[in-house]
From Swiss-Prot:
Domain GAF: start-end pairs: 227-406
Keywords (A to Z) from UniProt: Chromophore, Photoreceptor protein, Receptor, Repeat, Sensory transduction, Transcription, Transcription regulation
Identification of the protein by name: Phytochrome B
Lineage summary: Eukaryota, Viridiplantae, Streptophyta, Embryophyta, Tracheophyta
One GO biological process term: red, far-red light phototransduction
Skewed-composition ranges (Basic residues): 1-12
């Protein structure tokens, strides 16, 4: 179907069962599938070639049956050589290969002499030695100016970025697009006839093509997010509008390597191909590799006879044509095109970022071929190289947009999976295991399937389309017999997986994924055969098409695909297997924990490890950050959640004339910025406090003092949300750069004030690097600061193309995506749409990486007509770059901590359920009174821990919206639970605990949130024990209750609780964190601060009192007294 298509059937590459595992296993599996497909491709190619040599018709149906046969290694090598070094080109252009050092011709196409008018017949006066042959100096074939251009191109580092080069034949004067690329033995020059003889028109045409691509890109970027179908529909319309092909389609490659037409724009009278699925071998792996190397492929006329390439006999192997725009199509593909009535085609590769394993190698290896955008035409069609180049830019933008949409879809899917897993685990532990099948959500909601089942303790719980109980028992016996040492199994074909009873299941159950929970308990997911889900919107088979099963045609491709997937389900995707594997691990751990008795010890060990991990690193990062802020030569300031200054470094104080002391507490918006910047500053704050961090925003700061009167300071800032340990936003930090000098110059420059040349070429350090473009994106200005920044002189740069030639070849960019973005910015500016502070990075002449901000404005003449663009570059100071690096390091560490915390909160639930279950078993036994009290204390601690990890949202505590869960409880039970939490620490430190608590407290029943009160008191007591003198020290708990009757016969218990220790007590910074700081310094301080706020929510209060020889917490709390006792524990 698409360019590079060959024969039309693939033996399914995942026929054997695969064990469920991680994405790394899945990646290796995908590689093995691709390698296996190479064999199938080579076999089909050999069958096609043999049929041609023997004069027999290539029987499509018979070829389908032979793809499973093995292929000798030499046959695969021959096949790959044929694909990559076929020795023929298309006749719409000619090709010359040259030795790079000597310019000597080493190969040429047989039509080159005629096309370049070099034959003696066409030029009778031509000397024989000038006729093109092996060894000819290629420069003698073209005009002197053309030769100079070729010499310059040969010296370029990235030669392809200079394409196309406009050159003329020496003898005829005919113009050509020269498209150059390097191969292993030299440089290949593809020559395509140009349609105009004016080079200026050629450049203008190229720019016009780019403008059309930019317009299409802008349309793509304006689409609403979350709709990949709309994105694909839009891109086919844009490509068809750009190129004029009769039909344009988007092909998507699925994980099992087969393809599908997911979008189509066509002439109304053509048969639709939307919805067509085709076998993996329709586009062989070798062709897919070529698309990653050469992302645009044009076939002008499939009926045209390919032209042979003649080469130097000293070359060891045929010339590599992988990167050639003229490479001839393979015979089977040309035949396929002819059969479907498509004479010409254009194929554009859609490249997106690969997965983590693919990205290890970096560069092109980190990119993945997602699919193709293909244009078909019913007559001969050729589009010039500049337009094809513009289409390539459009594909890069489409790939970027698609990548973002795929990442968003993946994140939403992952959230759904995590939520479903959590609900299933909770359901399993709260109820009975069959609940994950019988209730909602069920295990069918985890992955796409037609049925699912649980086999638990010999009982069968089916849901949806599933085998019968007798059949599932047979499957379980087969699994234990042949896959007993595995942790799971997945297959899209039970017959191919070797299950002997597959025939009895029919088409209803073809694919199966199974997860072993224990050696006797299993989870199953089932899928029916694929064909029932796939429909093609194309025309029905016509009775007159008698050879339809044998001819290579889209309809026969679809038929072949249905044959391939017969008795198969859709394959289990990597993400689906990861979800199943994750649920399996969680359930296995849950089953074990419910049976184990030492779960509590595991929880404590895990929590202890979590508490210590990473603290030293975070402290180090925090100290480094503070030092950088204080000493930086970049202006840095910070505000709290109300927008008031709480950080103000020396540089911003110097710029504004406002000292640190004067700035503290002032409103950034109302006191420190100009009126015209107030809206911008308010938006910055609003977004940052919601977690959206704006970058490169310009604000105008006021200045104070006699010397600063009526001056303004312009700073470009990045807004960074300041977060506490639990990821709550507590303020905003602004890391800025002073651009006042550049701003003044730029304003004068744009308004054509002052002496133009004096401004541009001034060596004054306040003059920023400036370059300019004419209407055709050629460089027309390159100032002194730009020379210093890049290492390239004005004379070397002016007149060259900014996109590709300057930024691309001279100043290398990081990949084609960066060039696409730069091209869009430049064309937008020429079109009147200014771009401000665009992140722009490149390598200078010496290979140093330069990170900058690019501002592009339209350039007008005295009459107001647009004549190009001005571009200004701002460079971040070293201090700012270091500050940003440290900020990213801190964010990464905080994110890592958050992930670990989320993991702990999730994983700790199962051991806690195990403790709860153990407690419930103990309650049913004969216990002494003391044992009952211990059990009650254990249950109280377990409830406290469950509530902490369930309600971890500190923001609700901060703003006073935490929901309290009130109940009746014994006050004595709370005290016992609180004391139990410090007993181990007391023993370790050798500290004595003194309890001065009235006996009646034990049976006093009150009403309130027992778990929160217990949490608060335990934290205060724990911190006092931590800082008590050791050894031989002591801590005293002194409780004084009093009864206060109020209206309606209700009595309130007024509690005064003192926690006392001798000596100095808590460190001052801990007390500071507890009472005053919104940006805590210590973990203990955060805990005490949260507990103080929780106590306040319960209408209580806390004081910390330091006396000469002792210190103590004084906790005051009023709780309503109740007459009935609390419900039984458990």
């Amino acid at each position: 179907m698409a360019s590079g298509s060959r024969t039309k059937h693939s033996h399914h590459s995942s026929s054997q069962a695969q064990s469920s595992g991680t994405s790394n296993v899945n990646y290796k599996d995908s590689i093995s599938k691709a390698i296996a497909q190479y064999t199938a491709d080579a076999r089909l190619h050999a069958v096609f070639e043999q049929s041609g040599e023997s004069g027999k018709f290539f029987d499509y149906s018979q070829s389908v049956k032979t793809t499973t046969q093995s292929v000798p290694e030499r046959q695969i090598t021959a096949y790959l050589t044929k694909i990559q070094r076929g020795g023929h080109i298309q006749p719409f252009g000619c090709m010359i290969a040259v030795d790079e050092a000597s310019f000597r011709v080493i190969a040429y196409s047989e039509n080159a002499c005629e096309m370049l008018s070099l034959t003696p017949q066409s030029v009778p006066s031509l000397e024989k030695c000038e006729i093109l042959t092996i060894g000819t100096d290629v420069r003698t074939l073209f005009t002197p100016s053309s030769s100079v251009l070729l010499e310059r191109a040969f010296g370029a580092r990235e030669i392809t970025l200079l394409n196309p080069i406009w050159i003329h034949s020496k003898n005829s004067g005919k113009p050509f697009y020269a498209i150059l690329h390097r191969v292993d033995v030299g440089i290949v020059i593809d020559l395509e006839p140009a349609r105009t003889e004016d080079p200026a028109l050629s450049i203008a045409g190229a720019v016009q093509s780019q403008k059309l691509a930019v317009r299409a890109i802008s349309h793509l970027q304006s689409l609403p997010g979350g709709d990949i179908k709309l994105l694909c529909d839009t891109v086919v319309e844009s490509v068809r509008e750009l190129t004029g092909y009769d039909r344009v389609m988007v092909y998507k490659f699925h994980e099992d390597e087969h393809g599908e037409v997911v979008a189509e724009s066509k002439r109304s009278d053509l048969e639709p191909y939307i919805g067509l699925h085709y076998p993996a071998t329709d586009i062989p792996q070798a062709s897919r590799f070529l698309f990653k190397q050469n992302r645009v492929r044009m076939i002008v006329d499939c009926h045209a006879t390919p032209v042979r390439v003649t080469q130097d006999e000293s070359l060891m192997q045929p010339l590599c044509l992988v990167g050639s725009t003229l490479r001839a199509p393979h015979g089977c593909h040309a035949q396929y095109m002819a059969n479907m009535g498509s004479i010409a085609s254009l194929t554009l590769a859609v490249i997106i970022n690969g997965n983590d394993e693919e990205a290890v190698g970096g560069g092109r290896n980190s990119m993945r071929l997602w699919g193709l955008v293909v244009g078909h035409h019913t007559s001969v069609r050729s589009i010039p190289f500049p337009l094809r180049y513009a289409c390539e830019f459009l594909m890069q933008a489409f790939g970027l947009q698609l990548n973002m949409e795929l990442q968003l879809a993946s994140q939403l899917s992952e959230k759904h999976v995590l939520r479903t897993q959590t609900l299933l685990c909770d359901m399993l532990l709260r109820d009975s295991p069959p609940g994950i099948v019988t209730q909602s959500p069920s295990i069918m909601d985890l992955v796409k399937c037609d049925g699912a089942a649980l086999y638990y303790q010999g009982k069968y719980y089916p849901l949806g389309v599933t085998p019968t109980e007798a059949q599932i028992k047979d499957i379980v016996e087969w699994l234990l017999a042949y896959h007993g040492d595995s942790t799971g199994l997945s297959t899209d074909s039970l017959p191919d997986a070797g299950y002997p009873g597959a025939a009895s299941l029919g088409d209803a159950v073809c694919g199966m994924a199974v997860a072993y929970i224990t050696s006797k308990d299993f989870l199953f997911w089932f899928r029916s055969h694929t064909a029932k889900e796939i429909k093609w919107g194309g025309a029905k088979h016509h009775p007159e098409d008698k050879d339809d099963g044998q001819r290579m045609h889209p309809r026969s491709s679809f038929k072949a695909f249905l044959e391939v997937v017969k008795s198969r389900s859709s394959p289990w995707e990597n993400a689906e297997m990861d979800a199943i594997h994750s649920l399996q691990l969680i359930l296995r751990d849950s089953f074990k924990d419910a049976e184990a008795s030492n779960s509590k010890a595991i929880v404590h060990a895990h929590l202890g490890e979590m508490e210590l991990q990473g603290i030293d690193e975070l402290s180090s990062v925090a100290r480094e950050m503070v030092r950088l802020i204080e000493t930086a030569t970049a202006p840095i300031f910070a505000v709290d959640v109300e927008g008031r200054i709480n950080g103000w470094n020396a540089k911003v104080a110097e710029l504004t004339g406002v000292s640190v002391e004067e700035a503290m507490g002032k409103s950034l918006v109302h006191d420190l910025v100009y009126k015209e910047s107030q809206e911008t500053a308010e938006k910055l704050l609003y977004n940052a406090l919601r977690g959206e961090e704006d970058k490169n925003v310009e604000i105008k700061l006021r200045t104070f003092g006699a010397e600063q009167l009526e001056k303004a300071v312009f700073v470009v800032v990045n807004a960074c949300a300041s977060k506490d340990y639990t990821n709550n936003i507590v303020g905003v930090c602004f890391v800025g750069q002073d651009v006042t000098g550049e701003k003044v110059v730029m304003d004068k420059f744009i308004n054509i004030q002052g002496d133009y040349k004096a401004i541009v070429h001034s060596p004054n350090p306040l003059i920023p690097p400036i370059f300019a473009s004419d209407e055709n994106t050629c460089c027309s200005e390159w100032n002194t600061a730009m020379e210093k920044l890049t290492g390239w002189s004005r004379g070397e740069i002016v007149g060259k193309m900014l996109v590709g030639e300057i930024f691309g070849s001279c100043c290398r960019l990081k990949g084609p995506d960066a060039m696409t973005k730069f091209m869009i910015v430049l064309h937008n500016a020429i079109g009147g749409q200014d771009t401000d502070k665009f992140p722009f990075s490149f390598f200078d002449r010496n290979g140093k990486y330069v990170q900058a901000l690019l501002t592009a404005n339209k350039r007008v003449n005295m009459e107001g007509d647009t004549i190009g663009a001005f571009c200004f570059i701002q460079i971040a100071s070293p201090e700012l770059q270091q500050a940003l690096r440290v900020q990213r390091q801190q964010e990464k560490k905080c994110y890592s901590q958050m992930k670990e915390l989320a993991y702990i909160c999730q994983e700790i639930k199962s051991p806690l359920n195990g403790i709860r279950f153990t407690n419930s078993l103990l309650e049913a036994t004969n216990l002494t009174e003391n044992q009952k009290q211990y059990l009650e204390t254990s249950a109280a601690c377990e409830r406290q821990m469950s509530k902490i990890i369930r309600d971890i949202d500190l923001e609700n505590i901060e703003d006073g919206s935490l929901t309290l869960e009130k109940e009746d409880f014994f006050l004595g039970s709370v005290i016992d639970a609180v004391v139990s939490q410090v007993m181990l620490l007391l023993r370790e430190k050798g500290v004595q605990l003194i309890r001065d608590i009235p006996e009646e407290i034990k049976t006093l029943t009150v009403h309130g949130d027992q778990v929160r009160i217990q949490q608060v008191l335990a934290d205060f007591l724990l911190n006092m024990v931590r800082y008590a003198p050791s050894p031989d020290g002591w801590v005293e708990i002194q409780l004084r209750p009093s009864m206060m009757p109020i209206s309606d016969g209700v009595t309130v218990v007024h509690i005064e609780l003192r926690i006392i220790c001798p000596g100095e007590g808590l460190p001052p910074e801990l007390v500071q964190d507890m009472f005053h700081s919104s940006r805590w310094v210590t973990q203990e301080g955060l805990g005490l601060s949260m507990c103080r706020k929780m106590l306040k929510l319960m209408n209580g209060e806390i004081q910390y009192i330091r006396e000469s020889e002792r210190c103590y917490f004084l906790i005051i709390l009023d709780l309503p007294m109740t007459r009935k006792g609390p419900k039984s524990v458990g």
